[in-house]
Amino acid sequence: TPNKNLERVAQTLKGIPCLLEIVGPLSEAQENVLNENKIHFRHEVGISNARIAEKYQEADVLLFPSTYEGFGMPILEAQLTGRPVITSDYSAMREVAGDSACLVNPFSVESIRQGVLKVIQEDEYRKELVEKGTENVKRFSAHNVAKMYWALYQEMHATQH
């Protein structure tokens, strides 16, 4: 889908030796953009949750410069497996990632490229993102989310009485 920003990802990765793993369907136009930018890629469709977990384990980094997401679950999934995340400084992605990801402008190829290069070239920065990501995931544990909902319920109840 267009919000996944694959065209800008292809432009971003042009000339950077890598294998882009894509989970989900690709349109012919998207495949053409990847090929035009000489991006080495593989994609899988309709895979199990277990296979998705394997994909994260096999990855070096999650590049997720989406222009719109309802929540941004891939951020947490990647962080749960100890992977650094590059994502949009935008909408739900910023809220989910906080300071635990390299935040980029999803509408700027140059911004995304700078983020990618920083994460792959700077070992200390990458380690810092992994450590912060491990902590970030804890914010979204079932226990912590239940506590947040309970606090919200109490606040709403208090304002009605």
Q: What spans do the regions from the language model cover?
A:
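Carbohydrate transferase catalytic cores enriched for Leloir-type hexosyltransferases
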Residues: 1-161
